[in-house]
Design a protein with these regions (language model features):
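Conserved catalytic-core segment of nucleotide-activated headgroup transferases in glycan assembly
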Residues: 203-283, 287, 292
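Short hydrophobic beta-strand element within catalytic cores of glycosyltransferases
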Residues: 317-320, 327-331
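A conserved catalytic-core segment of Leloir-type glycosyltransferases
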Residues: 39-106
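Membrane-proximal helix-turn-helix segments that form the acceptor-binding/catalytic region
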Residues: 28, 105-110, 145, 157-180
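A short, active-site helix/loop in glycosyltransferases that binds the activated sugar's phosphate group
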Residues: 127-129, 168-197
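A charged, aromatic-enriched C-terminal amphipathic alpha-helix characteristic of glycosyltransferases
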Residues: 366-397
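Acceptor-binding helix/loop patch of EC 2.4 sugar-transfer enzymes
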Residues: 71-95, 135-168, 204, 209
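Acidic donor-binding loop of glycosyltransferase active sites
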Residues: 175, 296-313, 326
């Protein structure tokens, strides 16, 4: 057993975004191999900065499961800078500069001294100068951050070239990089001047055990949503990430334009997660707003919907749908980073033909689609199960694989 420290810019458990699902899933997989995994998050979420938490000290400790814990630093310097940057729509450039300059919490330095291996969750958390810099230090890539900044607001776009330089230097900065898709692997490989990196693929897989629901949960959630057995329910889950917001806008427009079609065919779409700041219902559209857990909505649903049309890397929600044994209805772009084949493994759609695709979906019964979803999972689970993905990845990394 070895001590692994994962440095994160924000508290990741419980996961509230696709990125946090990826981070905590990798951490869990490492812990279940037998390592002692310590996530150190340099800032908390808004609700963490309550007087009661601050009175207990500037680090909030939580045990996630045996062998896995998270420490969340609640110091006001990091907290205020995070709040201001978010309010002004700035990326976490400030965080990168602070960590790269060695301006970090004392507790993090202590954790680094005790660590055998260090992992940076995203390039915004670079290696920290100090005696621990000689330890194996890995980057967990979620996507190409500079691509996301290019697609972001005008203010975010100004930092795209800076982030491209940071990511371009990553092959010379880290021991190796855990990539998430072919896109980021190709980028890092093109900047690996010495061709020394393995760049193992850890797709945005999930823990399938979390997506095995109790028999009564489906009926319980559908009753809560006011649905009966004859109603069809599609789920779209997402955070406030810009491509999700745009997809949500398309879903809203579709539900309004096709209100008669949706009502006639008893089809509903539930949008689960913080992609919307408020909960409401408008005809066939059910919006949950921020919720503690989106998984019960997967249990209630008949298919997973993904209308995302831009971004980078791969889409965690696709892997969640597969693990929940949901048939997938998605844009072709939405399945990037997977090996799914259109109309063999999922129903490909666009905003223009979604009506026809829904008709095709409801034209077969649920028994057919459940069997289809099980078959798709069986054929693709090795690329979806985070435990398998992490096991394979570390097996090819000599300094890290030797710790198994």
């Amino acid at each position: 057993m070895k001590k692994i420290v994962i440095i994160s810019g924000n508290r990741i458990a419980p996961a509230a975004t696709g990125g946090q699902v990826r981070s905590i899933s990798i951490a869990r997989a490492l812990a279940r191999i037998g390592h002692s995994v310590h996530i150190f998050s340099t800032a908390g979420r808004r609700e963490d900065y309550r007087p009661a938490n601050l009175r207990r000290g500037i680090t909030m400790e939580s045990t996630i499961e045996p062998g896995l814990k998270e420490s969340t630093h609640l110091g006001l310097t990091f907290g205020v800078m995070q709040a201001v940057a978010r309010r002004l729509d700035y990326p976490r450039v400030w965080q990168h500069h602070m960590l790269a300059s060695g301006i970090v919490p004392t507790r993090l330095k202590q954790a680094l001294r005790e660590a055998d291996v260090v992992m940076s969750d995203l390039p915004y958390c670079p290696p920290i100068p100090g005696p621990w810099r000689e330890k194996p230090w890995y980057l967990i890539s979620h996507n190409l951050e500079h691509k996301l900044l290019e697609q972001g607001s005008a203010r975010q776009g100004r930092f795209a070239d800076w982030m491209r330089a940071v990511e371009g230097a990553a092959p010379q900065t880290y021991t190796d990089i855990l990539v998430c898709a072919e896109e980021d692997r190709a980028f890092f490989r093109s900047h690996d001047i010495q061709s020394r990196m393995m760049l193992p693929m850890v797709r945005c897989g999930v823990d399938p055990r979390l997506y095995s629901f109790s028999p009564g949960l489906r009926q319980q959630m559908r009753a809560k949503l006011g649905l009966v057995d004859e109603d069809w329910l599609l789920v779209f889950s997402g955070s406030g990430f810009a491509p999700n917001v745009e997809a949500f806008r398309d879903i809203k427009e579709f539900c309004r334009a096709e209100a008669e079609f949706m009502a006639r065919n008893r089809v509903y779409i539930v949008v689960a997660g913080s992609v919307s700041s408020e909960a409401y219902r408008d005809g066939a559209l059910i919006v949950t707003g921020p919720v503690p857990d989106v998984l019960p909505y997967f249990a209630a649903s008949d298919a997973g919907l993904n209308m995302v049309t831009r971004g980078s890397g791969s889409n965690v929600k696709l892997f969640e749908y597969l693990a929940a044994r949901l048939p997938v209805i998605s844009t072709v772009f939405g399945v990037r980073g997977t090996e799914l084949m259109a109309f063999e493994d999922y129903l490909a759609c666009s905003r223009n033909d979604l009506t026809e695709i829904i008709l095709r979906f409801i034209g077969s019964n649920r028994v057919f689609w459940r069997a289809k979803a099980e078959d798709v999972w069986d054929r693709h689970k090795h690329n979806c199960d985070i435990q398998d993905l992490v096991n394979d990845a570390i097996s090819v990394l000599p300094p890290f694989g030797s710790l198994r």
